[in-house]
């Protein structure tokens, strides 16, 4: 789950937060260049997709459906309220990012950008706090099945798609 914690932190504090901090300190040009994907106008999509990667890891699928062999199901079996909290934090972060007016490069200091940073911080806190300690108490054989499912259903197909997409470029 540490990778998911890192992603939530990076989206909130670096990808949105760094340009925001530069902008509010009157470094507007540097703020613009600090925006990831500013030239393609797809920053919000990239940031939301980062949050979706957390969702994919937690749900054990790439579709938004929850696998029976997911971390979500394993957590729900021991703490249904925590599972609901994690899912809400993921959904809230993705929605807050999408609520930033498009393009992000023209709305760096918007109230919605601040809300997105806060939602990412909340997600990070839930992941590295309650969720991490809950996972430590889940049976290792259950977690092994969750990891196997994640690798087989999320990781390997993702890399296969990336490889195919890369080959299509040439």
Model-inferred region functions:
Residues 1-170:
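Mature extracytoplasmic or organellar-lumen-exposed domains after removal of signal/transit peptides
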């Amino acid at each position: 789950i540490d990778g998911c914690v890192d992603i939530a932190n990076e989206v909130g504090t670096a990808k949105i937060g760094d340009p925001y901090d530069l902008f509010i300190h009157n470094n507007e040009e540097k703020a613009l260049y600090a925006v990831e994907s500013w030239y393609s106008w797809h920053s919000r999509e990239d940031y939301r997709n980062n949050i979706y990667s957390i969702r994919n890891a937690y749900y054990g699928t790439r579709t938004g459906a929850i696998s029976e062999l997911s971390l979500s199901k394993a957590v729900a079996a021991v703490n249904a309220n925590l599972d609901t909290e994690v899912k809400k934090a993921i959904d809230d972060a993705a929605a807050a990012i999408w609520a930033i007016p498009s393009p992000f490069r023209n709305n760096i200091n918007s109230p919605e950008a601040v809300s997105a940073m806060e939602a990412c911080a909340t997600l990070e806190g839930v992941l590295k706090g309650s969720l991490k300690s809950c996972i430590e108490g889940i049976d290792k054989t259950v977690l092994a099945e969750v990891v196997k499912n994640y690798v087989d259903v999320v990781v390997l197909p993702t890399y296969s798609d990336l490889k195919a997409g890369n080959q299509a470029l040439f």
